[in-house]
Design a protein with these regions (language model features):
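Alpha-helical transmembrane segments and their short interhelical loops
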Residues: 100, 104-173, 177, 223-229, ...
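Aromatic- and glycine-rich beta-strand/loop motifs that create alpha-glucan
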Residues: 1-33, 252-261
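Hydrophobic alpha-helical transmembrane segments of multi-pass membrane transport proteins
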Residues: 38, 57-129
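Junction motif at the cytosolic side of a transmembrane helix
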Residues: 128, 216-219, 227-266
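Transmembrane helix segments
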Residues: 38-47, 162-202, 206
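Membrane-interfacial helix-loop-helix junctions in multi-pass membrane proteins
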Residues: 18, 134, 183-238
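Hydrophobic alpha-helical transmembrane segments of multi-pass membrane transport/permease proteins
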Residues: 20-47, 57-77, 117, 174-181, ...
Length: 266
């Protein structure tokens, strides 16, 4: 366990340092959140300036937060890991005893910090609009924790065998956009066919957005929030376990560790 903690701390430090050295990476991860929030603020201002009383911002804050988490996790986590494999960095790591779980989790602390910053912004906006009291705040904290854990687990699973950073970035950016539109808030259910609504509600990202909207704006979710939590938790556990088991250090195939070579020659 002591070795596991040392590896985790070392990887976390390296990951944080790399992000500090490449501020454009951090900016790109935050851009999606900032853009979606700015759009919602502009729409709300437009409604209120015309005398309307529709709370578009409160209804879509959950989607804004989920979109920000998708950018940090699906793009900002999976792409750097695949790039490390593509450059051969992971192959070098494979020559020393390093638990996969410690390495993968060590990539997350600095990215979790970005998610927490986005969460703080969402809470400030929601509080300013009078949406928060004790119970919703605690529920949103639970939703954010479980939902972010799910997205990070999926990101690690995607990165576990990815070979091309460019292809991963393009695919994950497209997935992030699609799941935001499939979450239901940006496209009303009334204009979507019933089968499409059912398909969108089957997506774990929709569970995240629905639970967050219920916490932040009191919007009724299509299922009880604890049920949505349970579904997201199951996805997180399954994806993280599979990511650790399938993680490949080498772009040309799984690199053997020194002790594995010794067993082969014995």
């Amino acid at each position: 366990m002591r070795h596991w903690r040392r590896v985790f701390a070392h990887v976390a430090m390296i990951s944080a340092r790399d992000l500090l050295r490449t501020p454009m990476t951090t900016i790109s991860m935050a851009t999606v959140f900032v853009v979606f929030l700015a759009i919602q603020l502009l729409l709300q201002w437009s409604v209120e300036s015309q005398g309307g009383d529709v709370d578009l911002l409160g209804a879509d804050l959950g989607i804004v937060f989920m979109a920000g988490c998708c950018a940090v996790a699906l793009v900002g986590t999976s792409v750097p890991l695949v790039a490390m494999r593509e450059r051969g960095t992971l192959r070098a790591f494979a020559t020393v005893p390093m638990p996969r779980s410690a390495f993968l989790l060590g990539m997350l602390p600095v990215r979790v910090a970005i998610v927490l910053l986005e969460m703080a912004v969402v809470l400030v906006v929601a509080g300013a609009r009078g949406h928060l009291d004790g119970a919703p705040l605690a529920r949103f904290a639970a939703t954010a924790t479980i939902g972010a854990a799910m997205l990070f687990a999926v990101a690690l699973l995607v990165a576990s065998r990815g070979r091309s950073a460019e292809a991963t970035q393009q695919s994950m950016a497209m997935v992030s956009i699609l799941v935001v539109f499939a979450s239901g808030g940006l496209v009303p259910d009334e204009i979507v066919p019933g089968w499409a609504v059912a398909a969108m509600r089957a997506l774990p990202t929709t569970w995240f957005a629905e639970a967050a909207a219920a916490d932040l704006a009191g919007d009724p979710a299509f299922a009880p929030v604890p049920v949505l939590w349970a579904g997201m938790a199951l996805v997180a556990v399954a994806a993280s376990a599979t990511a650790v088991r399938r993680f490949d250090w080498d772009s040309r195939g799984r690199a053997r560790r020194p002790n594995e070579r010794e067993k082969t020659h014995a």
